[in-house]
Amino acid sequence: PVAPEYLFKKEEDKGANKEEEEVAPELGIRA
């Protein structure tokens, strides 16, 4: 559903830990 580029950008914006919990549920995926 989402490209790795999107996760990478979020990771740098908030951090792998926060991004995982914030982005995963929002898009319905798990980093």
UniProtKB/Swiss-Prot annotation:
Family under the similarity heading: Belongs to the aspartate/glutamate racemases family.
Biological source species: Anadara broughtonii
Temperature dependence: Optimum temperature is 25 degrees Celsius.
Location of region: Disordered: 1-31
Function description: Highly specific toward aspartate and entirely inactive on glutamate, alanine and serine.
pH dependence: Optimum pH is 8 for both directions of the reaction.
Enzyme Commission (EC) number: 5.1.1.13
Keywords, ordered alphabetically: Isomerase, Pyridoxal phosphate
Biased composition (Basic and acidic residues): 7-18
Required co-factors: pyridoxal 5'-phosphate
Record text on activity regulation: Inhibited by hydroxylamine, aminooxyacetate, phenylhydrazine and sodium borohydride.
GO molecular function terms noted in the UniProt entry: aspartate racemase activity
Record-given protein name: Aspartate racemase
Domain of life according to the entry: Eukaryota
Keyword Ligase: no
Reaction catalysis annotation: L-aspartate = D-aspartate
